[in-house]
């Protein structure tokens, strides 16, 4: 079938397509005209390879993510499993908040920071929670980097999902179940420090 554009993003374009007779998603990093041609080609190639690797590593760690069917570094394209289901941002519940916390801790346990940890990047497929979009992910052992993931999801849960009572608390419960209380408390302290810096910057 002819690929159909379903989302045009700042970093990549997303197409609905098929692969070996199965529904699939094609993610293509389009060239950036403001970058030097060779530099742009190198950046898109490296980011494509890195994202595909992160998806595979996350899956091995027990995090549901789309299967990678094909990677074309030259054309900066990843063809992956199409996940049928509903976006978590539309069906959020306390139980899903807890599961998102568990997934986040699993990801951080293998030193991967997601980089865009929002409810928009989770899909619930029947009873399977799937984490999407590793395009901004990176390796880090720094507590402050991990805290940026928690800071973002905390902000999202407090603003977009205010109707879910105790959403971030349920997230933390899930996180503690994997990371343990001591490590989680240390990360949350970093989250508070980031928040304080943000408030100070707005005041000054």
Write out the residue ranges for each language-model feature.
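Short strand-connecting beta-turns/loops that link adjacent beta-strands
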Residues: 19-22, 73-75, 126-127
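Conserved kinase catalytic-core helix
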Residues: 55-63, 87-120, 125, 129, ...
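C-lobe/activation-segment region of protein kinase-like
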Residues: 130-204
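Short hydrophobic-acidic sequence motifs that mark active-site Asp/Glu residues
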Residues: 16, 23-27, 79, 131-133, ...
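Conserved hydrophobic "DFG−1" position in protein kinase catalytic cores
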Residues: 16-19, 28, 70, 82, ...
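Short glycine/proline- and charge-enriched loop/turn segments
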Residues: 32-39, 86, 133-135, 150
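ATP-binding glycine-rich loop module of kinase domains
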Residues: 2-49
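Conserved structural core of kinase catalytic domains
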Residues: 30, 34, 44-48, 52, ...
